[in-house]
Amino acid sequence: MTYPDDYSTDVQKNEMDLKEFKEKAYLAELESKVLRLELKNKDITRENVQIKKENEILKRELDKLRIPPLILGTVLDRVNERKAVVKSSTGPNFLVNLSQFVEPDDIVPGARVCLNQQTLAVVEVLPKEKDYRAMAMELEEKPDILFGDIGGLNNQIRDIKEVVELPLKNPELFEKVGIVPPKGVLLYGPPGTGKTLLAKAVARETNASFVRVVGSELVKKFIGEGAKLVRDVFKLAKEKSPCIIFIDEIDAVASKRTESLTGGDREVQRTLMQLLAEMDGFDSRGDVKIIAATNRPDILDPAILRPGRFDRIIEIAAPDEDGRLEIFKIHTDKMNIKSVDLREIAKMAENMVGADIKAVCTEAGMFAIREGREYVTTKDFKEALLKVTGKKEKSEEGIAHLTTMYG
């Protein structure tokens, strides 16, 4: 059987096409394998680099662990460019050499240094010592209280802004007028009137650092410890300036000095004297301001009340009717109230302070929840007033009873 010539040619052409297709497919497969290998190689290279980095870090950590500890010392005097007299932490004084890595200008009396165990040479200069308790008093996050969240204290807010905010933000105004800006402000008044709230609002409204101290934290057991903490607090404030120091319950450390003293009373008086010295010491036009709060101004030492220490003494009294109404509006702003005449409630809340009004609003909400409602009515507020007033009267009766018993 014979085939046409063109048939043979077609077969040969198809065979060549098939062969060419197989070659292309094989090449494509090879290229794909090469690409996968290249990607795998890159991954291995990256892992290798990462392992080398980790290995270097571990080696450095191991070297640190192998280095013997250094001895702490305090510089007493620098003899020349390469020698100094140092008091070691173990007790004796040494004349030691300075390492080439230490700048001679950093070796000053009182500087903390590290000494080599073998040669006692100065190998490092440490930063100034700081009391961790003073560092912990700085607020990293600003409080969330604004002046608009405080009701019934418009005059007091104006006064504290003039004393604290204005000298920090516009000190040139005082220079133009030719007066010295106030150094500090003392807030006094019954508990719950908003003294601490004012300090929080100042911290929020200014860009200054804020150091909060409770007076009892400055009272320590051992001699000189409280005074050292006071020094460290003011040193921290200067380093963080502009800064505001807020001393809450200052009567714990600044009560009147008497002649009959126990050991604890003497230490409190030493702390007070250090506080007085620090308040006199910092620059009045500097960026450090002090705010203090107390509900017992009658027991404060006269020395701390004189002008130059607390230049402005602001009374935070119980609010009047308009002030109570303003406070009720602030606390009920996010409450679901229905047909409530806040003016009437404010009239009924006579002699109440801000903390009492907040308690009334909370109790009114609790009465509504107890009855299964999602809104608060006038009845809830009236019942809350009776409940909070009853608690307050019982508390005052208890205090009067204790006063009668113990004088």
UniProtKB/Swiss-Prot annotation:
It is found in: Cytoplasm. Consists of three main regions, an N-terminal coiled-coil domain that may assist in substrate recognition, an interdomain involved in PAN hexamerization, and a C-terminal ATPase domain of the AAA type. Belongs to the AAA ATPase family. ATP binds at G192, T193, G194, K195, T196, L197, H331. This is Proteasome-activating nucleotidase. ATPase which is responsible for recognizing, binding, unfolding and translocation of substrate proteins into the archaeal 20S proteasome core particle. Is essential for opening the gate of the 20S proteasome via an interaction with its C-terminus, thereby allowing substrate entry and access to the site of proteolysis. Thus, the C-termini of the proteasomal ATPase function like a 'key in a lock' to induce gate opening and therefore regulate proteolysis. Residues 22-67 form a coiled coil. Residues 405-407 are annotated as: Docks into pockets in the proteasome alpha-ring to cause gate opening. GO terms for molecular function: ATP binding; ATP hydrolysis activity. Its main location: cytoplasm. It comes from Methanococcus vannielii (strain ATCC 35089 / DSM 1224 / JCM 13029 / OCM 148 / SB). The keyword ATP-binding applies. InterPro entries: 26S_Proteasome_ATPase, AAA+_ATPase, AAA_lid_3, ATPase_AAA_core, ATPase_AAA_CS, NA-bd_OB-fold, Nucleotidase_PAN, P-loop_NTPase. GO terms for cellular component: cytoplasm; proteasome-activating nucleotidase complex. Gene3D superfamilies: 1.10.8.60, Nucleic acid-binding proteins (2.40.50.140), P-loop containing nucleotide triphosphate hydrolases (3.40.50.300). PANTHER family: 26S PROTEASOME REGULATORY SUBUNIT. The keyword Mitochondrion does not apply. Homohexamer. The hexameric complex has a two-ring architecture resembling a top hat that caps the 20S proteasome core at one or both ends. Upon ATP-binding, the C-terminus of PAN interacts with the alpha-rings of the proteasome core by binding to the intersubunit pockets. SMART domains: AAA. GO terms for biological process: proteasomal protein catabolic process; protein unfolding. Keywords: ATP-binding, Chaperone, Coiled coil, Cytoplasm, Nucleotide-binding, Proteasome.
